[in-house]
Amino acid sequence: SLPFTFSCPSSHDALLDLLDEHRIEPSQIHTVVSRIRTLHAPNLAEENPVKLQRFLGALVDHVLYRAGQQDTKADDLRVINDLVLHIYELARAYPLRAAEHFVAKISLMQHNLMRGLALGALDPNARTWPRLSELAFLRMCVLLWPTSDKWHAVATPMHLLMAQYLAHARIRSLRDMASGLYLCSLVSSAQRESRRIVPEALNALFNIAAMLLSLHHGKSMHGRS
């Protein structure tokens, strides 16, 4: 049976160890996180706020971990959705620490993009477009942070990063195209309230449409020959 008491993991590795030690099923993770937050509520001990702020970082890492699995299943998606709710509540309780966690991830993604572009935007081995885990993280940013503000500590660098992806990454495969289209959908969601125009997203959509039309035209000509 599921224990009622758990330690409060201070890192993602500690969280994975806890889940493995107690043989926690994906369907039980939401309950485990709820119990950890209850057992380590900030009003129960002076050190608990610090514990929960570290736990927040572990939960963010676990979302990326689940989304980045090679064989992501429906269980993983349910876990991600459950964890986003916990992250949202903890981010509202500790906004400064939450912002630090998110900005650190955004900075790392931007560094990886620059390193990939340095290899050459068309190099098949260059990591330019975000992977599934990174797309899940950007979606979480759009859901959790106010994207209509003129300037925001998390949302502004997120907007700039998505614009960089769309402006500088080049489509080399259908996977790249899917990443580009999903980024455009995130941009649309993020700018729905402010109604800002993002030229990088419009240009990316135009380029993708042109590529698809070219492929369709090529197949049509091949079929007639």
What is each PLM-predicted segment?
Residues H62-S225:
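Eukaryotic nuclear macromolecular-assembly scaffolds and interaction domains used across chromosome biology
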Residues S27, R54, R78:
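Charged, alpha-helix-enriched surfaces in structured cytosolic catalytic cores
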Residues S1-L2, R54-L56:
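Alpha-helical repeat/alpha-solenoid scaffolds of the HEAT/ARM/MIF4G superfamily
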Residues S10-D17, M162-A167:
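Short amphipathic alpha-helical segments and their helix-coil junctions
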Residues S1-S10:
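Acidic, serine/threonine-rich intrinsically disordered low-complexity regions
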Residues A14-K51, H62-Q69:
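Extended amphipathic alpha-helical scaffold segments
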